[in-house]
Design a protein with these regions (language model features):
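A beta-strand edge to alpha-helix "cap/lid" segment located at domain peripheries
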Residues: 2-18, 67-163
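Short solvent-exposed beta->alpha transition segments
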Residues: 51-70
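Short, aromatic-enriched amphipathic alpha-helices that serve as compact interaction elements
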Residues: 19-35
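Short, well-ordered alpha-helical segments enriched in acidic and aromatic residues
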Residues: 36-49, 53, 117
Length: 163
């Protein structure tokens, strides 16, 4: 992204340029943070002036991110997410993901998506571009059953689950 970016002095390792190992670590850190469903905690991984496109919504800044995530997790109940590294280069990482959730009526969904991430030198994400599709599923179609929170290390990832 061109132009001045955040003057945020916080650093969040690993920092770019990414290696295979550090990119995988960054993806798992993001998955773990999102599985907390804590908007304030999640927002700290982004620059103060971070830019997002999530589906058709455009956001700028941590406060907008917190507000968005609060709305999201008020709607998406019993949220469980798995992310997987797709590609990386320099300051950028691409991931694919799938998460399961239910609405207030008890209907279940699996949401599939791709994200493109760009990081500042500090290791904070300064740009996130996400494309997501929601697919209705039955209770019997669910694949994510770990307790709410971090996915256990021995739980299969997306590729292992055939997603």
């Amino acid at each position: 992204m061109e132009g001045p970016m955040s003057s945020d002095t916080n650093t969040r390792a690993p920092v770019p340029p990414f290696t295979l190992e550090s990119a995988i670590q960054k993806v798992r850190m993001a998955e773990d943070a999102w599985n907390t469903r804590n908007p304030e905690q999640v927002s700290l991984a982004y620059t103060i002036d971070g830019v997002w496109r999530n589906r058709s919504e455009f956001l700028i800044g941590r406060e907008a991110i917190v507000q968005f995530l609060t709305r999201k997790w008020d709607k998406e109940l019993d949220y469980r997410l798995i992310k997987e590294l797709w590609a990386f280069h320099g300051t950028r990482i691409a991931v694919r993901f799938a998460y399961e959730w239910r609405d207030e009526e008890g209907s279940w969904f699996r949401s599939y998506g791709n994200e493109n991430w760009e990081f500042a030198d500090s290791g904070l994400m300064r740009r996130r571009i996400a494309s997501i599709n929601d697919i209705p599923i039955t209770e019997q179609d669910r694949k994510y059953f770990w307790p709410i929170g971090r996915r256990p290390d021995d739980h299969p990832g997306l590729s292992e689950l055939g997603l």
